[in-house]
């Protein structure tokens, strides 16, 4: 048993701190007037829209995007997350999947879902229809009991929902009658919030069945199917989106999916940013800060693994991820020149106190203005201790008009080109380093040059 004096001493320290902060005179209770004026204000919404426009990543496009809606008569917006305001915000944002005592959530009128946005942005005369298509989770009582030991009620937990064929049939009917199908799928807060981990990375509930059915319709009709993935973690997508896995991937199963966008917790105006990108109002420029595996068995699959951690493939599966760190497409094409280091010392070698200045020419070879995120990676070619093959050191966002070229420059301190020794010290080892510049972390997307450190 604790002595009561110990509790008194602890309480005394807390009260003394509150006194020093002036909380007894001014408890600083929430200012409702300020809350109403600031939270979800026009400036907040403008900033959220700007950030989301730049963060949504276009991962696949067979040429169907941007979609020209001027001649479209009907667009089908499908999926359990197409009109889900809470999933756009994420966990602990106005509400939570972890407790049942939160308020009613973020005011709905402040949130623009994907369905809302298409209704607002399509031309007059184009009808937007919605079908849910699938459920993700069913909420059931916690098997641990209705209450926590302290008497607080336990929230219900989410379990994977069963496939609902009637919902899929409704979505198929809408898809057949539409010029464009936008399917919004992913995770809900019960699966990604605090204290929540799933035993699989696959889409749960009836989502895979829905995507397969929509993909079949798209192949039969030739109408574009755009999949929007809302998730805050990498997910394993079905064959209808990324093809059939194997040592050699069979892409034929994914021919029905025209395009794929990833939107991680896009926020209040997320639906507007997504619709703008699909309709070509906004140029996609987001790049992946994570890597998407093809199968959970590939993990770990992040780009900067220690050399020798994996072979080049499994016996039954490629080691290449579905989508790699740094990947993301736009609506134009770019051509990279060869990287050049322009400040090599007369000795031919840099010292640890030097900075490497590198330049590369980037050209917009397409017909639209576009944004490219030029990425610079460093690799220490021979190391005394096992270390990663390459690491991102810098990146630049470059906007170019059609036919325009620009020299993109990077200044990388040699002191940043470190490895970690067995004593956990970061050190720069003398020797040859490679500078890799390009579109993503994939080797085939990078241009290479080398420099020496003495």
Across the structure, where does each feature detected by a protein language model lie?
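Secreted, periplasmic, or luminal enzymes acting at the cell surface/secretory milieu
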Residues: 1-115, 119-159, 230-371, 377-379, ...
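Glycine/threonine-rich flexible loop motifs
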Residues: 86-89, 185-205
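Structural alpha-helical scaffold elements that stabilize or flank donor/cofactor-binding regions
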Residues: 171-174, 253
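An anion/phosphate-binding loop that grips the pyrophosphate of nucleotide cofactors and donors
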Residues: 178
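Short, hydrophobic/aromatic beta-strand segments
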Residues: 369-376, 388, 420-422
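Intrinsically disordered, low-complexity Pro/Gly/Ser/Thr-rich segments with frequent PxxP/GP/PP motifs
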Residues: 384-420
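Short glycine/proline/serine/threonine-rich loop/turn segments at secondary-structure transition edges
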Residues: 416-432
């Amino acid at each position: 048993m604790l002595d009561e004096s110990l509790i008194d001493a602890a309480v005394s320290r807390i009260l003394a701190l509150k006194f020093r902060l002036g909380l007894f005179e001014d408890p600083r209770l929430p200012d409702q007037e300020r809350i109403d004026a600031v939270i979800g204000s026009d400036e907040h919404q403008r900033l959220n829209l700007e950030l989301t426009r730049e963060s949504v990543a276009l991962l696949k496009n067979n040429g169907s995007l941007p979609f020209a809606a001027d001649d479209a008569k009907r667009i089908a917006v499908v999926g359990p997350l197409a009109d889900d305001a809470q999933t756009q915000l994420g966990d602990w944002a106005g509400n939570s999947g972890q407790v049942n005592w939160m308020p009613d959530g973020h005011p709905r009128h402040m949130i623009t879902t994907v369905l809302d946005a298409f209704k607002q942005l399509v031309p007059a005369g184009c009808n937007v229809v919605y079908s849910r298509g699938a459920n993700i989770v069913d909420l059931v009582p916690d098997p641990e009991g209705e209450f926590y030991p302290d008497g607080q009620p336990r929230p219900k937990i989410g379990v994977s929902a069963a496939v609902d064929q009637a919902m899929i049939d409704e979505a198929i009917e809408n898809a057949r009658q539409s010029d464009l199908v936008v399917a919004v799928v992913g995770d809900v807060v019960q699966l990604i919030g605090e204290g929540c981990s799933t035993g699989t990375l696959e889409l749960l509930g009836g989502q895979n069945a829905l995507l397969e059915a929509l993909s079949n319709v798209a192949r039969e009709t030739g109408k574009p199917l755009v999949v929007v993935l809302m998730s805050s973690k990498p997910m394993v997508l079905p064959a209808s989106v990324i093809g059939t896995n194997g040592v050699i991937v069979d892409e034929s199963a994914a021919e029905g999916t025209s395009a794929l966008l990833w939107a991680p917790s896009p926020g209040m105006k997320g639906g507007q940013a997504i619709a703008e990108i699909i309709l070509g109002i906004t140029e996609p420029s987001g790049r992946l800060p994570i890597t998407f595996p093809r199968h959970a068995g590939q993990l770990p699959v992040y780009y900067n693994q220690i050399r020798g951690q994996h072979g080049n493939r499994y016996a039954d599966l490629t080691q290449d991820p579905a989508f790699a760190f740094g990947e993301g497409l736009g609506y134009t094409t770019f051509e990279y020149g060869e990287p050049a280091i322009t400040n090599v010392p007369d000795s031919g070698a840099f010292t640890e106190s030097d900075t490497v200045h590198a330049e590369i020419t980037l050209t917009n070879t397409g017909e639209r203005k576009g944004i490219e995120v030029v990425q610079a990676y460093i690799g220490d070619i021979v190391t005394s201790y096992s270390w990663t093959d390459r690491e991102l050191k810098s990146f630049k966002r470059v906007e170019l008009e059609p036919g325009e070229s620009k020299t993109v420059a990077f200044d990388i301190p040699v002191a940043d080109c470190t490895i970690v020794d067995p004593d956990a010290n970061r050190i720069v080892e003398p020797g040859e380093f490679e500078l890799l510049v390009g579109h993503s972390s994939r080797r085939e997307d990078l241009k290479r040059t080398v420099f020496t450190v003495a």
